[in-house]
Structure formats: structure tokens, C-alpha cells
């Protein structure tokens, strides 16, 4: 009996494999598709050695750079097997455009929901299909122009930030301060009141919330990398951190549901027509868990993306005094006044500095999608790598914004250099129009709703820093190394020294 059952099982497996192979053959023949160039994985049938190599690179803070170097050898689009799953890796802008926009319906987030669910639940960054569309529609109103331009709230938290930065030339890690600042500004914008981390003493509830938030999201990256094996790993600290963050946000949700939604002013008090996201959600939903999930999904992006950008900006400014000096020349035109929303838009060099930091250090430097059907990508097949390639149902497509942003075909021979002027038409060189070659905030239907808010806040902080400090110097000459959480940051922080403007 046992042998009969085993025989039936093996027969079913073989039949399923043959059926899949026939399906692939017919689809490829019908559409004239080639296969992407395979990575040499001799003896590594399930891709475990590849996984170990990737983990080693990540520990060394070099995974992004090594991917870029590999594309110089193998081309921008390759196929491989990783932990038993077929995947294609690409940095070709046409392929990324297909995945994110023109063939959007052929791909979903894959296992992201399972990996992130214990912390983020179901929300805009973990859902697909109608549920994602519903979440996006709920969140969009809170990121209108009126919300983007809430400069008085930003100023309040900038003052707290500036009070924490020594101006006597002593060394400070700006990266940590920026993440503290954006936690306050993001929670103020989303919850109607800040957690108050910047002004809280060590051991406070706000500090515990911040630490739990950071540690929980860091472990999400581990869960994502473990793929189908994530269920075998239990992390008690992760569970405790999730519970702490959930309990804290649930208190805000309960307060919001306990009162009717009402107009709020820019400082969060009753008065004008400003609504924070929590009030918006509480006025249209009653499911406490779903409200919390949506808030955490947006908080993760709103807080970490801006902090990542600011850290990259000042990491480079501390090493490029010429750029700092030119920024000063532009900012001095404000004559010490706080920038208005209209003035922010006029600061062309400030925007160029932000764009160059986003190019070299995109906050989300890589991402993945999963094919939901047999489909294709525009390029990567054939000897020249320019022919369409087949993508089987279930294939993981990994795309690297980091590598694409270093393409000499898009950015010229100096693509690896830091040069904000490339974004300004100031010489005989052709104006830079990278199109789908510049995606710091993704693209297509899932493009980041908060990109203007992030750019506004980052520009405001840069200008206020320039108005406060006369000089900035690097106090760490080690080369930049990545720290990959859900967003990119510097492994060594941003160790600098600043001196106050005299008078």
C-alpha cells in the first residue's frame, strides 16, 4: 500500500512538472521569447551558496556595490535560482518600467505580506489588488498640497533638532538625530501629535517606542530574506517589539475613535481644515486593527525615507565643501527668513543636491515583484541582451534602483561621482532627462504618495541647517558602507562637526 501511495505521489509530481514544462514551451514559442542569461551556479542546485554569498556581502555592507560590479561583468539582466526559487535580477530601466507600470497587472508583491504582516499587518505597502486600491484611496487625501505645506509643524521639530546639534566643532552623528527628528515630525503629521522623542529623556516611553519600532522593522528584512523558511525562525524580541509598538499606536487610535473627526489647525488644535491621517481614518473606519495597520504602513515610509535622504545629503556635503559653499550662496538670498513653500520651489540648487543624494543613495535601493502569470520583460535575451525575455509564472523579479542610478548610459561617464550640477542646465551638455532611469520614489501605479512631502521636509531642513551652521566637516574618512533595513542608511552613521554662524 505504501509503495502504491508513493508511486501515485511521484506520478502526480512528474505529471505536474511535465505540464508546467509544456505550458512554458508553448508560451515561449507563441511569443518568440528567449531566456535571460543564467548565472553560473554549478553544483548549487537550489541556490544556497548564492544565498550565503549575499548574506556575507550584506554583513560587510557591500551587497549593493557587489550587485553593481556583477552587472558590469554579466550585463544588467540575469537569471538564477535562490533557495529553490527562480528569479531574474535586472537594472535595465525598460524592464523596471514594465514591472512597475506597463505590465503592472502581471506582477504582485509576492511574499511581502507574509514577511511583514506580524508588524505592519495589511496596509498600503503589503497589499495587492482591490485591498491596495482601497488603502491608497484612504491615504491620498492626507497628502494633499495643504498637508505637504505644513511648514509650521516642520519648523517646530527642526528647532528641537537644531538644539541637539553642537555648533562648537565637536563630533556628532547626524544620522541618528535625523531619524529622531523624522519620528517626531511623521507622528505629528499622521497621529495629530508627536511622540516627543527628541525632547524625551533616556528610558522614556518615547525612547522605548523608537527603539522597538527600529528593531522590529530591522527584523522584517531578515524575515523577507528567509523566504519560505521564515516560519522556522521565532524571535521573541521581535514579538515583544511588535506588541509594544502596536499597544502605543492603539492608544492613539482609541482616542481618535472616541471623538468625532473635527477640523484641525496646523498645530493640531481645532480651528482650520487640516486633518491628520488618523483623524481621517477614524472618521471613515471603525476597525481599530485596520486603522493601526494603515498608520504603521505610512509611518514606516514617512519617517524612514526622509531620514535616509537627509543622512545621505549631509554625508556628502561634509565631504564636498564646494557644494556646501554653493548652497550657502543660494540660501543667503532668504536673508535668514524661514523658507515658504513657494521659496522652497525656487531653490534650484537645493533641489539638485537632493536629487543627487537620491540618485546615489536611493532610500529603497532594491525591490522585488513576483510574476502572477507567464509574461515577459522587454530586454535581456539574445547575444546582445536586447531581446525580450521569458518570465515564468511565480518567478521573482529583483530590480536594483541603486545599480540603474549608476548607469553611464543614463548619467554619463561620471555616473559614480557626486555632482549635483548634473541636474542643472548650466553648460553645453545636454539637459539630464533620465525618465525611468531615475526612480527614488518608485514609479507607476504604486509610486510613492508622499514624495512631495518628503522633498519639502528635506529641503526645509537643509535650508534651516545652512542658516544655522557656517561649516560642516567630516569626522569619519571611512568609505560609505550600506546598512540595509527596509530603507538604506549609512553603516557608520554620519559623523560630522559643525560650527554655528557667527552673530
UniProtKB/Swiss-Prot annotation:
Q: Name one Pfam family in it.
A: p450
InterPro entries on file: Cyt_P450, Cyt_P450_CS, Cyt_P450_E_CYP52_ascomycetes, Cyt_P450_E_CYP52_fungi, Cyt_P450_sf
What does this protein need as cofactor?
heme
Superkingdom per UniProt: Eukaryota
Give the Gene3D superfamilies listed for this entry.
Cytochrome P450 (1.10.630.10)
Q: Which CDD domains match?
A: CYP52
Q: EC number(s) for this protein?
A: 1.-.-.-
Print the keywords alphabetically: Antibiotic biosynthesis, Glycoprotein, Heme, Iron, Metal-binding, Monooxygenase, Oxidoreductase, Signal
The positions making up the signal sequence are 1-15
User: Is the RNA-binding keyword given for this protein?
Assistant: no
Q: Which residues bind heme?
A: 448
Q: In which pathway does it act?
A: Mycotoxin biosynthesis
Stored PROSITE patterns: CYTOCHROME_P450
At the top of the EC hierarchy, this enzyme's class is oxidoreductase
PANTHER family hit by this protein: CYTOCHROME P450 MONOOXYGENASE APDE-RELATED, P450, PUTATIVE (EUROFUNG)-RELATED
Instruction: Describe its function.
Output: Cytochrome P450 monooxygenase; part of the gene cluster that mediates the biosynthesis of burnettramic acids, an unusual class of bolaamphiphilic pyrrolizidinediones that display potent antibacterial, antifungal, and cytotoxic activities. The first step of the biosynthesis of burnettramic acids is the hydroxylation of proline by the proline hydroxylase buaE to generate 4-hydroxyproline.
> Which family does this protein fall into?
Belongs to the cytochrome P450 family.
Task: Provide the protein name.
Answer: Cytochrome P450 monooxygenase buaG
List the source organism: Petromyces alliaceus (Aspergillus alliaceus)
Q: Which gene encodes it?
A: buaG
Amino acid at each position: 500500500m505504501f509503495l502504491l501511495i508513493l508511486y501515485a505521489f511521484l506520478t502526480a509530481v512528474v505529471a505536474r512538472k511535465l505540464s508546467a514544462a509544456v505550458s512554458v514551451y508553448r508560451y515561449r514559442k507563441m511569443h518568440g521569447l528567449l531566456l535571460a542569461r543564467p548565472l553560473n551556479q554549478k553544483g548549487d542546485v537550489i541556490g544556497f551558496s548564492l544565498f550565503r554569498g549575499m548574506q556575507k556581502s550584506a554583513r560587510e555592507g557591500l551587497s549593493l556595490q557587489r550587485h553593481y560590479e556583477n552587472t558590469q561583468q554579466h550585463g544588467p539582466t540575469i537569471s538564477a535560482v535562490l533557495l529553490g526559487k527562480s528569479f531574474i535580477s535586472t537594472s535595465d530601466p525598460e524592464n523596471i518600467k514594465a514591472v512597475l507600470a506597463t505590465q503592472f497587472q502581471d506582477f504582485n508583491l509576492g511574499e511581502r505580506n507574509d514577511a511583514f504582516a506580524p508588524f505592519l499587518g495589511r496596509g498600503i505597502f503589503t497589499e495587492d489588488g482591490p485591498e491596495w486600491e482601497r488603502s491608497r484611496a484612504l491615504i491620498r487625501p492626507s497628502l494633499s498640497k495643504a498637508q505637504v505645506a505644513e511648514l509650521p509643524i516642520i519648523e517646530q521639530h527642526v528647532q528641537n533638532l537644531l538644539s541637539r546639534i553642537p555648533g562648537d566643532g565637536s563630533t556628532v552623528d547626524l544620522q541618528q538625530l535625523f531619524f529622531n527628528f523624522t519620528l517626531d515630525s511623521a507622528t505629528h503629521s499622521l497621529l495629530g501629535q508627536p511622540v516627543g522623542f527628541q525632547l524625551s529623556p533616556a528610558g522614556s516611553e518615547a525612547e522605548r517606542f523608537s527603539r522597538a519600532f527600529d528593531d522590529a522593522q530591522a527584523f522584517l528584512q531578515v524575515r523577507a530574506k528567509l523566504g519560505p523558511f521564515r516560519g522556522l525562525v521565532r524571535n521573541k524580541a521581535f514579538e515583544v517589539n511588535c506588541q509594544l509598538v502596536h499597544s502605543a499606536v492603539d492608544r492613539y487610535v482609541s482616542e481618535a475613535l472616541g471623538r468625532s473627526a473635527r477640523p484641525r489647525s496646523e498645530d493640531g488644535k481645532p480651528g482650520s481644515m487640516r486633518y491628520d491621517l488618523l483623524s481621517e481614518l477614524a472618521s471613515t473606519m471603525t476597525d481599530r486593527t485596520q486603522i493601526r495597520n494603515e498608520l504603521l504602513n505610512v509611518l514606516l515610509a514617512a519617517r524612514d525615507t526622509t531620514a535616509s535622504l537627509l543622512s545621505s545629503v549631509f554625508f556628502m556635503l561634509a565631504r564636498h565643501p564646494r557644494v556646501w559653499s554653493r548652497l550657502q550662496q543660494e540660501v543667503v538670498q532668504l536673508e535668514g527668513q524661514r523658507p515658504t513653500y513657494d521659496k522652497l520651489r525656487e531653490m534650484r540648487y537645493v533641489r539638485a543636491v537632493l536629487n543627487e543624494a537620491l540618485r546615489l543613495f536611493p532610500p529603497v535601493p532594491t525591490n522585488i515583484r513576483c510574476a502572477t502569470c507567464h509574461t515577459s520583460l522587454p530586454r535581456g535575451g539574445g547575444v546582445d541582451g536586447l531581446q525580450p525575455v521569458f518570465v515564468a509564472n511565480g518567478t521573482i523579479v529583483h530590480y536594483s534602483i541603486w545599480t540603474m542610478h549608476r548607469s553611464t548610459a543614463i548619467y554619463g561617464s561620471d555616473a559614480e561621482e557626486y555632482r549635483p550640477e548634473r541636474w542643472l542646465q548650466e553648460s553645453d551638455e545636454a539637459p539630464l532627462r533620465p525618465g525611468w532611469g531615475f526612480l527614488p520614489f518608485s514609479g507607476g501605479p504604486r509610486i510613492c504618495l508622499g514624495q512631495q512631502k518628503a522633498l519639502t521636509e528635506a529641503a526645509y531642513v537643509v535650508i534651516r541647517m545652512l542658516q544655522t551652521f557656517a561649516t560642516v566637516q567630516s569626522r569619519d574618512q571611512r568609505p560609505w558602507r550600506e546598512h540595509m533595513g527596509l530603507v538604506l542608511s549609512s553603516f557608520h552613521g554620519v559623523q560630522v562637526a559643525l560650527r554655528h554662524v557667527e552673530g
